[in-house]
Amino acid sequence: MDKKVYRALCQEVDGRTTKCFEVFNYMINEYEDRGKTRRYEFYRKQARKELVLNLVANKKMMSALDATLKELYDGKIKVGFIEQFRSAKWLSKTFNYYLSTNQTLIEVARENGVIDEDETEIVIGGDKNESK
């Protein structure tokens, strides 16, 4: 993996995240203009769908990046030491980018009422008792 692949993957996640935030904005504007209307509920449902799609896609990509990194460290991918170091650096950067994107999506969704607090615990994968 190199900088070119990293940029391509980041552009992909940025595009999906931008679309998700646009739907969030439609929902927020509708609520501010008219309150809880049918259109607001429709936009909220759409925002929830976009959020789930983004989180699932990012999670799958993070799993693939993690598996590739493990293969690299286990020696299943045969490259020189310098190339291994560079690949590990870009894999780690990409993984962290996807992770921070997921955290941002969850925070924005929680702040704007797209998901409820108990749903946030499920999405993050924790239990309310564990987070104390």
List the predicted regions and their residue ranges.
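Serine/threonine-rich, low-complexity intrinsically disordered segments
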Residues: 19-20, 39, 103, 122-126
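Generic short N-terminal amphipathic or hydrophobic helices
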Residues: 27, 76, 114, 121-123
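Residue-level detector of intrinsically disordered/flexible regions characterized by low predicted structural confidence
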Residues: 5-6, 21, 38, 80, ...
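Ser/Thr- (and often Asn-) enriched beta-sheet segments in non-cytosolic proteins
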Residues: 7, 107, 121-123
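Acidic, low-complexity, intrinsically disordered interaction modules
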Residues: 33, 37-116
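Short terminal alpha-helical segments
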Residues: 1-34
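Short acidic DE-rich linear segments
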Residues: 117-132
